[in-house]
Every structure is written in structure tokens, then in C-alpha cells.
Design a protein with these regions (language model features):
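Extracellular glycan-modifying ectodomains
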Residues: 2-6, 14-29, 35, 39-354
Length: 354
């Protein structure tokens, strides 16, 4: 795997200018997954001092030391935003299809869905928000955009007595990432049974190791005393297996590309598992969630990598609570990522013309 930067620990979704600066410091670059390189250890959070004084609403402090990100509404669903985002996705799907690329959406559910019993007193999803994930899936289905019910996938993991999110982190566990990679592989192969490339070019999976530390929500948003109260937790990550014949695979094009935020970064294992299951290289570009899904797609489509090689399948990872936020969602995305919907469409069309 020819990773241009080591795998990093992410910054959380940025709702404030300080978090935007932190996110830029921790941002990942375009990575090629499925060809070689070892998984690097996580980077220590670089914005701790800046963010400790942030509004406590950014993080919800639940029971038994559980922390929840606070950047999605627990009471209201932006139906108009869901409709508009789906319209933009449909435009992207059509333009990509005209260039021989199939667009699929990986919609990740909110952490709160799986640990409602750990939420603070008086904090809970309203009945309307409980139906939000299904509403987005139905909108994608009505638009003819392939996706799958990852909430159901992760509930199966949870029902097997495994955690799907870390207690003090916004991110998922390896068990959750692996299960989602399996469902994603099925989605890819259902639509494209014959992927280009050579059998045996997928990533070999290494052994798992554990490390004890604070989750990102604790590291970035709690004071030193508050962190001591919630405590560290054990992370399970998979080491990169030693590749065989590495030099032969370095330039092998990937038939599948994933674009998204820090949930799909290599540290948590999703792209490696997907590559292993598909038995093909998988390429990836990701940045922390404050950059937003709209800027991430453009980053890839406007890149030399896309111009040099168009994948057969583009998996666009999105997050349920932020699906309704469009390209111009001020206060949600990094200022550098903001643009009117019309500008986003213009850049999309320019990247995919010819």
C-alpha cells in the first residue's frame, strides 16, 4: 500500500474555528490502500489546549464515563436538507455514471442509536430523529443510489456483545468497521461482480494489537481532571501484514475508491478489510469531518489520481447526523470548505466533463 502519509488519529467534527485549525493539522491525504505500508501509531491530539474552553454542548457527558459528539440534532430532522442533499447526490451519480463510474453511498449511523442508555439525563433522540436514518436510506433508494442499512449491520455486532463505538471517542471499533466493510463489499460486488485488476492484489490482514489511551472526545474537549474521571480505554487495531512482492503492486490501479471522513481512515481498519474482501486494491481520500463530504468528493474528482485512473466504483461515506448539511452549511464545515450549492455543482461538472 503506497500511503503518502501515515495513518493518523482524527480530529472531531469541527463546529468552531479552533477545531477547524486542529482538523487541518491532523488531516489525512489521498492514500492508496491494498498495496503495501505499515499502519502508523496515532498522533496525539494537537488542539487540546485550544479546545478545553469550548462550549460544553460540543460533547455530551453521559453515564459511566460515556461521551457523545454533540453536532447532530436530537430533536429535529431537516427534511428539506435531506431532500436537497439527495438532489446533489443524484446529480453526482448521473455525471459519474456517464464517465463509467458507479456511485454508492455508505451511510454511517449516529453513535447515540446504540448507547441511548448511556446518554445524560434529559437527553434522548426524539421519535422523529429515531426515524432519520431510515428516512435518508429511503431517499437514496428512491433516487436509485445504492446503499445499505448499516444501522442494522451494527446492531448485529452490538447484539453479539461487542461495542460498535469507543466509550470516549466519536469513532467506531474494529468489529464495527469490519462488519461494515463486509456489507460494503457485498454492495460493491452486487453491482459490479467483476472488478478490474488481478486476483490476489487485495490487502493481507495482519494481527491485532491493543493500546490504552484517551478517546478523541476526551482528549480534545475535556480538562485534565475531567479526563482522569472518564479514564483511558483500550483500542484494538490491526497491524499491517508484511506484503509479498510489494514492488510489483505499488502502481496497481484500484477499481474501488472510498472518499469520506475519519471513520474510514486506515487506523480503524475499514479500507484494509474492504480491500482484503474484494481481493483488489482500494484507494482512499479522507479528512476529519469538519471538512465535510462535499469538499472531500471534489478533492478526489479534481485530483490527478482520478484523472489518471477512474475507478469502477466510488463509495462515498456519509454520516447520518450531517447528511442534511449542504456544501454551504456555515458553522458546520471548515470555512475553506464552504461554497454555494451552485458552485459545488459547477466544480463537479467541470471535474467530470470530457
Amino acid at each position: 500500500m503506497d500511503w503518502t502519509t501515515p495513518a493518523q488519529r482524527p480530529a472531531p467534527h469541527g463546529l468552531r474555528a479552533t477545531m477547524a485549525r486542529a482538523a487541518r493539522a491532523l488531516a489525512g491525504c489521498a492514500l492508496a490502500v491494498g498495496t503495501v505500508a505499515a499502519l502508523a501509531p496515532p498522533v496525539q491530539a494537537q488542539a487540546q489546549a485550544q479546545t478545553q474552553a469550548q462550549d460544553s454542548s460540543i460533547v455530551l457527558r453521559g453515564k459511566d464515563g460515556w461521551l457523545f459528539p454533540g453536532w447532530g440534532s436530537l430533536t429535529q430532522v431537516d427534511r428539506a436538507g435531506i431532500t436537497e442533499s439527495t438532489r446533489l447526490l443524484t446529480e453526482a451519480r448521473n455525471l459519474l455514471a456517464a464517465r463509467g463510474v458507479k456511485l454508492q453511498v455508505l451511510l454511517l449511523p449516529d453513535k447515540v442509536r446504540f448507547y441511548s442508555d448511556k446518554m445524560p439525563e434529559g437527553k434522548a433522540m426524539s421519535a422523529e430523529v429515531q426515524g432519520r436514518y431510515k428516512q435518508v436510506l429511503q431517499a437514496l433508494q428512491a433516487a436509485g443510489i445504492p446503499s445499505f442499512d448499516d444501522e442494522a449491520v451494527l446492531r448485529t455486532v452490538r447484539d453479539s456483545a461487542k461495542d460498535v463505538f469507543y466509550r470516549t471517542d466519536q469513532h467506531w471499533t474494529q468489529a464495527a468497521a469490519d462488519a461494515t466493510a463486509e456489507a460494503t463489499a457485498r454492495m460493491v460486488l452486487t453491482e459490479v461482480p467483476q472488478l478490474a485488476g488481478r486476483a490476489g492484489s487485495g490487502m493481507a490482514l495482519g494481527d491485532t494489537v491493543t493500546e490504552r489511551r484517551y478517546g478523541d472526545l476526551a482528549e480534545l474537549f475535556l480538562t485534565a481532571d475531567e479526563r482522569k474521571q472518564v479514564g483511558r480505554e483500550v483500542y484494538t487495531v490491526r497491524r499491517q501484514a508484511q506484503a509479498q512482492g510489494q514492488g510489483l503492486l505499488d502502481d496497481e490501479p484500484a477499481p474501488v475508491h472510498v472518499t469520506g471522513h475519519s471513520m474510514v481512515q486506515p487506523y480503524f481498519g475499514f479500507p484494509q478489510k474492504l480491500s482484503n474482501l474484494l481481493d483488489r486494491p482500494v484507494s482512499l481520500n479522507w479528512k476529519p469531518g469538519n471538512v465535510g463530504q462535499w469538499a472531500m468528493l471534489l478533492e478526489y474528482l479534481e485530483s490527478p489520481a482520478f484523472k489518471a485512473h477512474r475507478p469502477q466504483v466510488l463509495v462515498w461515506q456519509m454520516f447520518e447526523p450531517t447528511y442534511s448539511y449542504g456544501p454551504n452549511a456555515a458553522g458546520q464545515w471548515d470555512n475553506a470548505s464552504l461554497m454555494p450549492n451552485a458552485t459545488w455543482l459547477e466544480r463537479l461538472r467541470a471535474a467530470l466533463k470530457g
